Amino acid sequence: QWRHRNPAVSSVGRLDKETSGLLLITDDGKFIHRMTSPRHHVAKVYEAVTEEDIPAEAVELFASGTFMLNGEDRPCAPAVLEILEPRRARLTLTEGKYHQVRRMLAAVGAPVASLCRISIGSLHLDSLNLEPGEWMPIRPDAL
């Protein structure tokens, strides 16, 4: 349905069906590229609740730029992991590999129970005052 619009509308990145949070939708392909390409280093921040305690050594491991996910031929770009509680963390990425947050946390023994993307670049979900499923137009200068 979205692709049949003129101009076509696409999302800036994706969220899997088990993930909630901020999703941008636009008809500007250059904007999508600017926001999603690892070359532009646009931060995407996620909050995760895990089924097991998150090991402290994961902070340094994720930041190292040497962390490899199964099935990948390149290591993950350095990521910032903040452990908020033993089973709750905030993870900042500048790339978007398939199910990356879930795979990274599972690889260190802390499978994700719930996941929410809380920001993309300078746009923060909590500042938008939106309920789940609500949407609003955003001016390009807000990003």
Predicted regions and their residues:
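Basic, flexible Lys/Arg- and Gly-enriched helix-loop patches that mediate nucleic-acid binding at interfaces
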Residues: 1-143
